[in-house]
């Protein structure tokens, strides 16, 4: 199917758009959950408030033909995924053209970080362990959060499910998925109620694939059929968590997590040379505790986390002494946060969050300086809310202290970062207008500062300014009116303008690369999301979702440069996706299309650097059977239905048509 047709299909979905409910409460009490916009999922979708926020419910994710976490994030307005291909390829998220290092990834509200390269691989998380995904852009309207949540232009929060008990004191899930290219993925979880208010949960996930999929290698007029080799991926995780009521006012959450992956790296496709011997093994373990106490008008949250990561890189080639290279990288992070919030009136509250972070890094590579970074963050926030207006404002103080064991450490850094957001509900309970501004920055990561061949210790932070205006309309039919066919409808649009100063880029100098501050970038764009739920009969329903994004992201560093006003690499001007799901008593059917316009993989926008537009289609059939003692769900997927070959990252071809099937039991 051609890309132009896919864009027209997306636009038709947008003109006929997800489920919504409820107006906002008038108080800012400690038990108020400020709603956001839900892309799709269950039959509810709270609205955007002061910032641009979206929630993707995964309880009904079959409607979207989702394959993994990165595929789910791709459906959210403003989010782009960089995928290095293959079953186990690195998958990172960038929001509104700012780059993946500007996106904070959290798991159950606690940060997931990487001080070495500043980006998190979404492939380490499984959809099976998640309940919903939230994306916040700009000012964080949740002033109960730790200070680190205010540091990034956007925050991606992956939320696991809280246990729900009805007539029994346990829940159990067993699921196995199999598919093309040797893919096997079993998952199990078990949670148990302890007394009236406490529970524990254990889960484990394992996946394996050989990843040897076919692709077409094109060199001018010559085309050959090849097999992507050296692509085996094996990974798994185990997790133990608990929720406890320590007193009538105090709740405690605790979690331990271990993840390991062992991947062959196929590398980029090079003409007539498909041999690659690189492997990468990752290990990660963390333990965290979160305590929250709610009094009548005051909330206190204290949380701590220890995170350990190890990365083992191996390569074999004649260029290395002894014919092989073994590099090892280790990270440790200690994180602590304390948040206090007080409601002065029913409409006004203030909060203060203080975070401390200690990052350390070591490696066996020559020239490692064994760096450490102490970070102190303090965020003072205020929120006002009445029937028509919601406003939040934050002043973030950031203090960074750098240390190295060898040589001279980079300068310490401190900065004050303001942000503000306002939403207005003028006359109808379902119409909201919003505007926001955020001034923030990104510290250089350890690779950019210290890496042996190109790190530069004099780098300045990358500074960003975000401006956003938007509007949302929501409709939900009266539950008592069963005759109403239109059950829910939501439409949301945002215009944004981002400025980036002192952009950190890699530049070639003679025979080596160097990291420098040399860029000024402007990004202007539009995000559009719409959803629709229609009851086509008493027993059948139709669900439609659509997203469209326009981005004009250009380099304005030097008017004399060959790349002045050229679109930034890997950022398409046009992209979007849409889905249609038909649920009925026989078998449920869902269809999805993800379309991406042309883009360039190098800064200069010339024909040799252009990557063609593509559209990927998927179809899913799913059915749940309710038995007396358990539920069983069967699902089958066809991914890349039209057998389209495309690349998300240049020289890393994605798989063509593939198949998946799964069976899930819930007890």
Language model features with spans:
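Flexible loop and strand-edge segments within Gram-negative outer membrane beta-barrel domains
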Residues: 209-215, 224-238, 243-302, 306-332, ...
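Structural signature of Gram-negative outer-membrane beta-barrels, strongest in the C-terminal barrel
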Residues: 247, 345-498
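Membrane-embedded beta-barrel scaffold of Gram-negative outer-membrane proteins
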Residues: 301-315, 433-436, 462-524, 531
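Gram-negative outer-membrane beta-barrel transporters
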Residues: 346, 388, 486-490, 494-499, ...
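Extracytoplasmic beta-strand/coil segments of soluble accessory domains associated
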Residues: 70-111
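C-terminal beta-signal and adjacent terminal beta-strands/loops
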Residues: 544, 595-602, 621-667
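N-terminal periplasmic "start-of-domain" segments of outer-membrane beta-barrel proteins
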Residues: 35-64, 92
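A beta-strand signature from Gram-negative outer-membrane beta-barrel systems
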Residues: 127-173
């Amino acid at each position: 199917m051609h890309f132009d047709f896919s864009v027209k299909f997306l636009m038709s979905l947008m003109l006929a758009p997800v489920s919504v409910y409820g107006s906002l409460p008038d108080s800012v009490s400690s038990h108020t959950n400020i709603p956001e916009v839900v892309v799709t999922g269950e039959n509810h979708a709270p609205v955007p408030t002061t910032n641009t926020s979206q929630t993707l419910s995964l309880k009904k994710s079959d409607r979207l033909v989702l394959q993994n976490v990165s595929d789910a994030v791709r459906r959210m307005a403003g989010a782009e995924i960089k995928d290095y291909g293959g079953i186990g390829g690195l998958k990172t998220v960038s929001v509104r053209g700012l780059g993946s290092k500007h996106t904070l990834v959290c798991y159950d509200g606690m940060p997931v970080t990487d001080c070495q390269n500043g980006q998190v691989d979404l492939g380490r998380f499984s959809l099976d362990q998640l309940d919903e995904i939230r994306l916040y852009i700009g000012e964080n309207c949740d002033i109960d959060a730790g200070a680190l949540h205010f540091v990034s232009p956007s925050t991606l929060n992956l939320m696991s499910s809280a246990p729900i008990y009805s007539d029994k004191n346990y829940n159990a899930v067993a699921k196995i998925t199999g598919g093309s290219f040797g893919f096997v993925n079993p998952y199990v979880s078990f949670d148990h109620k302890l007394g009236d208010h406490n529970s524990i949960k254990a889960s484990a996930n394992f996946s394996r694939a050989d990843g040897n999929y076919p692709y077409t290698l094109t060199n001018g007029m010559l085309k050959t059929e090849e097999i992507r080799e050296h692509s085996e991926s094996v990974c798994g995780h185990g997790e133990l968590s608990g929720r406890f009521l320590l007193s009538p006012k105090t709740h405690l959450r605790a979690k331990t997590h271990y993840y390991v992956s062992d991947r062959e790296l196929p590398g980029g496709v090079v003409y007539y040379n498909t041999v690659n011997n690189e492997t990468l093994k990752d290990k990660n373990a963390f333990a965290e505790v979160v305590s929250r106490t709610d009094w009548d008008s005051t909330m206190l949250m204290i949380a701590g986390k220890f995170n350990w990561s190890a990365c083992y890189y191996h390569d074999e080639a004649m260029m290395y002494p002894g014919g092989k290279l073994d590099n090892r990288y280790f990270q440790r992070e200690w994180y602590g946060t304390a948040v206090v919030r007080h409601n002065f009136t029913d409409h006004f509250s203030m909060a203060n969050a203080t975070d401390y972070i200690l990052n350390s890094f070591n490696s066996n590579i020559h020239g490692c300086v064994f760096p450490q970074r102490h970070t102190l963050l303090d965020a003072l926030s205020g929120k006002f809310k009445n029937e028509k207006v919601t406003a939040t404002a934050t002043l973030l103080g950031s203090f960074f202290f750098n240390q190295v064991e060898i040589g001279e450490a980079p300068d310490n850094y401190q900065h004050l970062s303001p942000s503000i957001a306002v939403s207005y509900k003028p006359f109808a309970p379902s119409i909201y207008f919003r505007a926001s501004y955020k001034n923030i920055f990104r510290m250089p990561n350890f690779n950019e500062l210290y890496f042996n061949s190109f790190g530069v210790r004099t780098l300045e932070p990358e500074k960003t300014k975000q401006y956003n205006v938007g509007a949302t309309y929501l409709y939900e039919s009266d539950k008592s009116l069963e005759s109403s066919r239109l059950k829910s409808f939501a439409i949301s649009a945002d215009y944004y303008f981002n400025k980036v100063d002192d952009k950190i880029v890699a530049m070639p100098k003679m025979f080596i690369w160097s990291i420098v501050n040399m860029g000024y970038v402007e990004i202007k764009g539009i995000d559009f999301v719409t959803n629709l739920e229609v009851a086509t009969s008493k027993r059948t329903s139709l669900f439609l979702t659509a997203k469209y994004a326009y981005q004009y992201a250009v380099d304005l560093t030097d008017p004399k440069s060959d790349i002045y006003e050229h679109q930034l690499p890997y950022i398409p001007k046009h992209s979007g996706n849409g889905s249609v799901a038909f649920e009925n008593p026989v078998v449920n059917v869902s269809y999805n299309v993800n379309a991406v316009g042309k883009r360039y993989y190098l800064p200069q926008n010339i024909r040799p650097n252009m990557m063609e537009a593509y559209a990927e289609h998927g179809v899913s059939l799913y059915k749940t059977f309710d038995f007396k003692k358990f539920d069983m769900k069967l699902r089958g997927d066809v991914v890349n239905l039209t057998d389209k070959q495309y690349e998300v990252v240049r020289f890393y071809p994605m798989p063509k048509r593939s198949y998946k099937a799964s069976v899930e039991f819930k007890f």
